[in-house]
Amino acid sequence: MKDDHDAWEPEELVSDNNSSENELQEDQNSSITFLPPSVNKSNPAKSNYYHSTVTDDISKSQPYRLGVDEAGRGPVLGPMVYAVAYCPVDFDLTNYGFADSKTLASLKREELLKLICNKSNELGKNVGWSTMSISARELAAGMLRYRNKYNLNLQAHDTTIDLIKKVYESGINVTEIYVDTVGPPISYQEKLQAHFPQAKVTVTKKADSLFPIVSLASICAKVTRDIQLECARESIRTENWGSGYSSDARTTEWLKVNVDKIFGWKGDIVRYSWKTAKDLLELPSKSQSSIEIDWHEDDDTPTLNFTQKKKPNPASRSWFGSEFYF
């Protein structure tokens, strides 16, 4: 059975387990020992969608429970990865050692994801999972819109809804949904329940430590993000940039040392909407790393030409380079 690989963006990104193994064999200098199918090694800075379902011998019409969690909400570097995982309601996950991904060592997380990817064992047969990696560029593009800013909570909500919809579209009969909350849990639960009335929705804090299916989703998200970030680091051949969080001295030092005074950072891996990055580029009084640029606006003087439409202005003052219009 073939897993589905699509890009959330127009260009299709395709990878599979065999190509992942070949890439690792070819790159002997890589520190990556396991490349999950949810990571697009050839373009790790791009948004990417991945879906793997249960095996054909597992009935899709039986009741399923589904969990949702994310990784990388707070860092200034890399993608935010949302993951859903699902299994039959009567399949017991408790014996496999799932826990909140943040409480597990990285090697343990990778071992568990390897088990899930292996369709020859009972866990791999009964578990389906999907990830959506939202690139740093896409996150920043939404948050830096001139009008109708697309904040992180809305992006998270929409991604969660899209991922769950795709599971239903694949034929899985989801009857229980468990979500680690983003924002107030009550209003978020009501929102999801309205979208998915056929299931019982539970949204709560610390869901990743309360429900094994959310813990499983947490592992899928965390391993995907960690390896995707390392692939990005290797692709631009840069030194260790730490955890990617602004509180990490290695990360902030990397940002300061590697910023271009005009173009920012290479690799599309920095979230330009984060204060740490914005301060280095937009506040010369606080940082000497940037060059202040005066953007000339179009003349808004009214004319008598009522038939010619004004061409929209690209939001070029946004440093990350995404071409959206206002």
UniProtKB/Swiss-Prot annotation:
Cofactor note: Manganese or magnesium. Binds 1 divalent metal ion per monomer in the absence of substrate. May bind a second metal ion after substrate binding.
Annotated keywords: Endonuclease, Hydrolase, Metal-binding, Nuclease
Renumbered residue ranges of the record's region Disordered: 1-47
GO-annotated molecular function: metal ion binding; RNA binding; RNA-DNA hybrid ribonuclease activity
GO CC entries: nucleus; ribonuclease H2 complex
Superkingdom, taxonomy of origin: Eukaryota
Known EC number: 3.1.26.4
Keyword Iron: no
GO biological process, one term: mismatch repair involved in maintenance of fidelity involved in DNA-dependent DNA replication
Ranges of compositional bias, category Polar residues: 15-47
Functional description taken from the UniProt entry: Endonuclease that specifically degrades the RNA of RNA-DNA hybrids. Participates in DNA replication.
PANTHER family assigned: RIBONUCLEASE H2 SUBUNIT A
Record protein name field: Ribonuclease H2 subunit A
Source organism of the structure: Schizosaccharomyces pombe (strain 972 / ATCC 24843)
Encoding gene per record: rnh201
